[in-house]
């Protein structure tokens, strides 16, 4: 059984933004009997491995959270949400079925396997084999290369890579991998990040608002500008514009 606790991470010692507080309030609404626990520098060892140590030193706190969520759920179990996830419907049926994750990007159109994102929400019991494996995976990784530059890669790519080791199948329907139920995109990710279009269904339980706290101060402006361009001119339009002006 998944313990009745919701974990979230907030590193950097800045106050939580109003958007995060609204999301946390939605957790309280739909999980009234759950403890909600914040993890930060005071109760999580940011120097536990080179990846987290280097990310924290560079003030890339979202990448510290990428590892922390797996460590937390491996040792404690429970639910994990990023602070930009709003719960909009009851999830008790999903929690009752056991450990879960959700698809962020569907396979197809050249993508062989779906991308499964831990930022959409996680449910786990303590000591799950998958969580031990992904922690072992991260323990071999660095955040910075030998020149001090950030190494490309996201928690979604790392998560999906390890799920494939455990047998993730190339389809977008519900499947179970390593005792984890993987849910289709409409359950936890109805918002198209590229266009900002929201497509809720009767299955939708939560919305990931893509606050992108790891971006610089121009991040919100870039996010909304990019979505407008993608929505009206297509998702390949920005690449086309860049190509046009670099000929």
Q: How should each PLM-predicted stretch be described?
A:
Residues 1-65, 83-247:
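Glycosyltransferase-associated regions of secretory-pathway enzymes
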